[in-house]
């Protein structure tokens, strides 16, 4: 078998265009599958990360030898994180569960400021901040819409972030890992030729 040249090994995934979320966990061991996304998430530029930590090495030494007699390792943790700058009700339900989200049909302020004390009041959504595991599959679509990165068996948690109040909107940081030990959980795909 001939050595593979650099040009033959070029197979990049770069430039995410959008991130889709599906509640269903995809079985990446199958040759064909269908995924129906539930949400197209508005992700803050440069907040998307999918990384794996360095492995932990275990060195076994014996008397009289300077080097390792044997070496073993444990895989590093895989983590996924991204920031979604939206408080849309459908997103809140996906992040915290339907029972944590409620409608406020009218809130009336009595401040003496006629702009704030509108007789029509304010309407909106109430949220109970609680621990809720977001499970399923994310699909990252590249800028050309011809390549995908699929990460399934995800377990994510959302936390509210609003620390740059003058320049950034209220946002939620999704962070977590893959719970797919022993399962194929990441795939890179390219659009098939017609």
Segments predicted by a language model, with ranges:
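Short acidic (Asp/Glu) patches
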Residues: 55-68
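Mixed-charge, glycine-accented linear interaction segment located at domain edges/termini
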Residues: 145-194
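Charged, amphipathic alpha-helical segments
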Residues: 2-7, 85-126
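Oligomerization/assembly interface segments of phage tail-like spikes and tubes
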Residues: 67-92, 167-183
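N-terminal beta-strand/beta-hairpin edge segment
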Residues: 41-58
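A generic structural signal for short beta-strands and their flanking turns/coil linkers
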Residues: 46, 56, 74-80, 132-136
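Phosphate/anion-contacting hairpin/loop surfaces
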Residues: 121-145
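Polar/acidic, low-complexity leader/linker segments enriched in S/T/G and N/D
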Residues: 1-43, 194
């Amino acid at each position: 078998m001939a050595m593979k040249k650099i040009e033959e090994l070029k197979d990049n995934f770069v430039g995410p265009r959008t991130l889709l979320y599906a509640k269903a966990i995809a079985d990446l061991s199958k040759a064909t599958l269908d995924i129906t996304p539930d949400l197209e998430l508005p992700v803050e530029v440069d907040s998307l990360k999918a990384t794996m930590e360095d492995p932990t090495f275990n060195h076994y030494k014996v008397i009289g030898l300077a080097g390792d007699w044997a070496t073993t390792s444990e895989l590093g943790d895989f983590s996924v994180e991204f920031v979604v700058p939206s408080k849309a009700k459908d997103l809140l339900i996906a992040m915290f569960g339907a029972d944590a989200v409620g409608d406020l049909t009218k809130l009336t302020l009595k401040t003496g400021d006629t702009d704030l004390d509108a007789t029509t009041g304010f309407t909106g959504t109430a949220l109970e901040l609680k621990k809720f595991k977001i499970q399923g599959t994310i699909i990252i679509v590249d800028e050309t819409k011809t390549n995908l990165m699929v990460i399934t068996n995800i377990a994510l948690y959302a936390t509210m972030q609003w620390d740059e109040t003058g320049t950034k909107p209220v946002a939620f940081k999704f962070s977590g890992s893959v719970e797919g030990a022993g399962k194929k959980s990441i795939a890179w795909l390219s659009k098939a030729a017609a």
